[in-house]
Amino acid sequence: MELVLNSTTIGVGVVSLILLLYLFLRGGSWKSGEEGPPTVAGAWPIIGHLPLLLGSKTPHKTLGDLADKYGPIFSIKIGAKNAVVVSNWEMAKECYTTNDIAVSSLPDLISANLLCYNRSMIVVAPYGPYWRQLRKILMSEFLSPSRVEQLHHVRVSEVQSSITELFRDWRSNKNVQSGFATVELKQWFSLLVFNMILRMVCGKRYFSASTSDDEKANRCVKAVDEFVRLAATFTVGDAIPYLRWFDFGGYENDMRETGKELDEIIGEWLDEHRQKRKMGENVQDLMSVLLSLLEGKTIEGMNVDIVIKSFVLTVIQAGTEASITTLIWATSLILNNPSVLEKLKAELDIQVGKERYICESDLSKLTYLQAVVKETLRLYPPAPLSRPREFEEDCTIGGYTVKKGTRLITNLSKIHTDHNVWSNPLEFKPERFLTTDKDIDMKGQHFQLLPFGGGRRICPGINLGLQTVRLTLASFLHSFEILNPSTEPLDMTEVFRATNTKATPLEILIKPRLSPSCYESI
């Protein structure tokens, strides 16, 4: 749930909404005799609590403050829509176990239709036979442990290539006295992960030191960036359907244009793969596997090209954003906590040494690094508010009646920093996952820690995402000394967009830890 409104949009919207006050219908209210969750005071006519959520704080912080006042479950109004916000693990467990089927569908949002092939993508498809078939195919053909292992050479080669290029950049730009060079890691992590996912999905490698200005590469990245931005953008029509005709901010038009652009790009890849199949080329990326499996078939009446394009776009979007965001936060936290960095280097030197490059098989031995990634996801989950779901029937949560049609928002950030569960919850302490909290996992079985969501619609790419982050972070820290260029801690200001990203660039100092022969032999 992203709330992106510029000042002009808000101004025009509020004036129009007030003029249309008489149209307001108090739909979805709690019926007499049925006690709903506590309702946050101060809702505006028609626009509800939107002004609260558009304040200076990020929405998950604002909702966290409201939980301190109203309790672990409360209701708000987003335009004409009722929503309940749950903020502790007990309530989350009720939602994702007892009531999971009832909340397994998502609201029918404008972006899901205009960007996601009319809700054909698994991340927005309604819960039902079509969604179940998509998930089964995705899990068996791309995200199963055996398939993830089969593609390990792609991950390793992309990380190694990127490390080599970073070493060459260091050699060209290093300071003679200190031996350090300045790098901006947001871009480096982004291009590395983008290359990795594209190779696994469609066999493309768009970025290297020599091709970063390639027209096709830039076209693809621009379109994906726009998709990510628009998919999480708040539109007035979603909150107040009878005002959709106005298209405040022009977002719907942007969505149509971006959807068309991505459809053309992925369509070109699909045509290339069909040509390769005709020529007898044996390619084992996701697109080729899907063509072999689905060519000439339909899924619940859906055209095969739409299904394949939906799969590809889902994996690119979900596989890049969360991993990049986690890598940025992890590196920032490590630099702001020097003792953690020293422990990581010691573990890497003991388990891997400095005479060879890191392998995926080393990762299972890097227990402190695993704890660092886990603690990063606790403090900075990629989506601190869960993707909104919608109750398809009346339910009871925490003893309160929640009516059909109400939206569910889980404040993962608040759950992850609950002082009733975690000691010193706002501190970065990876050691907690090696001692008191070592048995808590991140895969939906322990509701105290849900960085990938919970229930039937938990993120299916957990294993691939964790493997990508661990390998990239371990390889980077193993290969380079890193240093904060300032005596002040790195700025940790958050920006709430598609993922909860770092507001400022991540500029740091690096120099090699290994001998030059190690980098050149990669």
From Swiss-Prot:
Cellular localization per UniProt: Membrane
Protein name: Cytochrome P450 82A2
GO CC annotation, single: membrane
Residues annotated as binding heme: 459
Induction: By fungal elicitor.
InterPro entries: Cyt_P450 (IPR001128), Cyt_P450_CS (IPR017972), Cyt_P450_E_grp-I (IPR002401), Cyt_P450_sf (IPR036396), Plant_Cytochrome_P450_Monoox (IPR050651)
Keywords tagged on the record: Heme, Iron, Membrane, Metal-binding, Monooxygenase, Oxidoreductase
ATP-binding recorded as keyword: no
